[in-house]
Amino acid sequence: MKKLQPVRGTRDVLEEEFKDFQAHLMLWNTLTMHYGFNMVDTPILEDSEVFKKTLGVTSDIIKKETYTFKDRSNNEITLRPEGTAPIIRFFINNKLQKSLPQKFSYVGPMFRY
């Protein structure tokens, strides 16, 4: 029988590595909050236009490196390949430009192949 493997671009994280990552994440959060960054989290799934508008339709990331699919309503959805575009969408949607400057910190999975 074929051995099942994690999907390309993903991996399993064992307990020791997970604990180490959590410790680093706690330190990161403490430092960024100390220096006035706001912790934010954006969805792993975004409308593909979020990335096309900020990265460009012809960029290698869009053309070759994203996990993109259509949902049941035929909307094109992309797994987040990087963090800047979702932060820009977040910033605009929440009208945060009214209170500048803004500093954001974010951590999360990014998906490219």
Where are these regions (language model features)?
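TRNA-recognition modules of translation machinery and tRNA-sensing kinases, especially anticodon-binding
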Residues: 1-113
